């Protein structure tokens, strides 16, 4: 697709008759599948049956998407109150990661209780997978030309030594923008490497998951400050408030669980 003289990628991957298949959905699906593969592989190593994470994903992903959409709609209610037919339209994006995370955690707790397994063990195993899915999923925002930052010049983007296809896709309505999707994606990929390395340290159970929350939240806080489409509550950027909250809560949980003797088991223990 061309916009002016700048070639750009089409957000529609293929057309199946009258039905367009968007890159956004394909990329999100790819992130889920790769994350599932990573979790099932590690789960089997730690004695978790392969179908456990398959079953969890089949339940958790739809619920996470529902919560992600609800979260987004709630903070954009002024628009959706006037356009209720758009509430269920997620083809163009509009999924808030923090909402999805809330839905996934609630589902994980209930699932673990029903299966009679430790939620913290499942959460630790899943942590790198979740972050991998988020790292990949940000490229869906890239295809949709959303979740970008403030205006910049082409020279600025070229100075980052980015490939032309990224620079061109950041050209929206005659203006170049910060590729904040890329900053967050790279931060998340680095986090995946960190979490995989920390598996070998044999942390106390639950602390790998809290490390994920802290790592993601720190990166999201700074990237959010560059974005122009932040969900707001008065003068506050909701994602930044949530990020600070998750860091504080994670640190408190780590300290309290250790002091109360609730973190005696290690990651590698069955």
Curated annotation (Swiss-Prot):
Report the locations given in the UniProt record: Cell membrane
Keyword Metal-binding assigned to the entry: answer is no
Q: Check the record and name the Pfam families matching this protein.
A: LGT
Q: Does the keyword Metal-binding apply?
A: no
Known EC number:
2.5.1.145
The membrane topology noted for this protein in its Swiss-Prot or TrEMBL record is: Multi-pass membrane protein
Q: Annotated pathway, please?
A: Protein modification; lipoprotein biosynthesis (diacylglyceryl transfer)
Q: Which UniProt keywords apply?
A: Cell membrane, Membrane, Transferase, Transmembrane, Transmembrane helix
One cellular component term from this protein's GO annotations in UniProt: plasma membrane
Q: What does this protein do?
A: Catalyzes the transfer of the diacylglyceryl group from phosphatidylglycerol to the sulfhydryl group of the N-terminal cysteine of a prolipoprotein, the first step in the formation of mature lipoproteins.
Q: Please report which protein family the annotation says this sequence is part of.
A: Belongs to the Lgt family.
Protein name as it appears in the record? Phosphatidylglycerol--prolipoprotein diacylglyceryl transferase
Source species of the chain: Bacillus cereus (strain AH187)
Upper taxonomic lineage? Bacteria, Bacillati, Bacillota, Bacilli, Bacillales
The gene it comes from is: lgt
């Amino acid at each position: 697709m061309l916009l002016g003289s700048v070639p750009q990628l089409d957000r529609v991957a293929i057309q199946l008759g009258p039905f367009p298949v968007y890159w956004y959905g394909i990329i999100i699906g790819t992130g889920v599948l790769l994350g599932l593969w990573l979790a099932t592989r590690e789960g089997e190593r730690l004695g978790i049956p392969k179908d456990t994470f398959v079953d969890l994903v089949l339940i958790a992903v739809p619920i996470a998407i529902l919560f992600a959409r609800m979260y987004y709609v709630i903070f954009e209610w002024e628009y959706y109150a006037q356009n209720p037919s758009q509430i269920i339209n997620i083809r163009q994006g509009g999924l808030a990661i923090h909402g999805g995370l809330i839905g996934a955690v609630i589902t994980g707790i209930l699932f673990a209780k029903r299966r009679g397994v430790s939620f913290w063990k499942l959460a630790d195993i899943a942590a790198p997978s979740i972050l991998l899915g988020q790292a990949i999923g940000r490229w869906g925002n890239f295809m949709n030309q959303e979740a970008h930052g403030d205006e910049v010049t082409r020279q600025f983007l070229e100075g980052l030594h980015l490939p032309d296809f990224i620079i061109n896709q950041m050209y929206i309505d005659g203006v170049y923008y910060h590729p904040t999707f890329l900053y967050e994606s790279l931060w998340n990929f680095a986090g995946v490497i960190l979490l995989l390395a920390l598996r070998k340290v044999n942390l106390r159970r639950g602390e790998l998951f809290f490390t994920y929350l802290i790592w993601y939240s720190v990166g999201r806080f700074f990237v959010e400050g560059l974005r122009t489409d932040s969900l707001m509550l008065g003068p506050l950027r909701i994602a930044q408030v949530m990020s600070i909250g998750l860091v504080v809560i994670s640190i408190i949980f780590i300290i309290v669980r250790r002091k109360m003797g609730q973190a005696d088991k290690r990651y590698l223990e069955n």
